[in-house]
A protein has these predicted regions:
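Adenine-nucleotide phosphate-binding core of ATP-dependent small-molecule kinases
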Residues: 80-111
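Glycine-rich phosphate-binding/hydrolytic loop that grips phosphoryl groups
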Residues: 45-47, 153-184
Length: 184
């Protein structure tokens, strides 16, 4: 990010099985990452999509036409299912359920990782779910009350971890087997 979007104050990155909030303050980097559970990540979104008989991109399309947001727990897929099933039984639309699932991811990420620390300034959105699911990103932008000037969506944001690794790669040096053995 320091190369592609140096104005970034906070990065939110969602992956298939992890979520991160990274604060950039005065040259310091503070990274907060979810623990052992994949609640609020791409795999959570896939699990919830299957409950309403679609996939992640289907959720995204449905969420474009939502009318209401229902509270859904995103901390754990099991708890979320117990919130969603009664809503399905009561006739909640797939549009409303889809937007509610995305809002649950937003709420889990913000409450579980920011833990009260403000997310403000220029915010970058990274990772596959935020790259491919426009309505998930829109839910973050709405919740954080960001304007276009403070929203950073780099090209290839779903590949940013790989791009960062490539930029940090140091040229390989030639080493003999005997020198490696000596180092051990």
């Amino acid at each position: 990010l320091s190369y592609y979007a140096p104005q970034t104050d906070v990065a939110i990155e969602l992956g298939g099985e992890d979520a991160k909030i990274i604060y950039f303050e005065g040259g310091n980097v503070e990274q907060r990452m979810n623990g052992i559970c994949a609640g609020g990540t791409g795999s959570f979104i896939d699990q919830m999509a299957s409950l309403i008989q679609t996939d992640a991109s289907g959720l995204n399309e449905f969420a474009k036409d939502y009318k209401a947001i229902y509270p859904i727990a995103a901390r754990c897929g099991v708890f979320a299912k117990t919130d969603i099933q009664p809503l399905i039984n009561e006739g909640a639309t797939r549009e409303d359920l889809s937007a509610s699932i995305f809002q649950a991811v937003v709420n889990q990420t913000i409450s579980g990782l920011a833990c009260g620390k403000p997310i403000r300034g220029h915010v970058a959105f990274l990772g596959g779910p935020l790259h491919f699911l426009s309505e998930l990103k829109a839910a973050f932008i709405r919740t954080l009350n960001l304007d276009e000037e403070h929203t950073i969506t780099p090209d290839n944001s779903h590949l940013f971890a790989a791009i960062g690794s490539a930029l940090n790669y140091k040229k390989e040096s030639n080493t003999t087997l005997s020198s490696l053995i000596d180092r051990l």
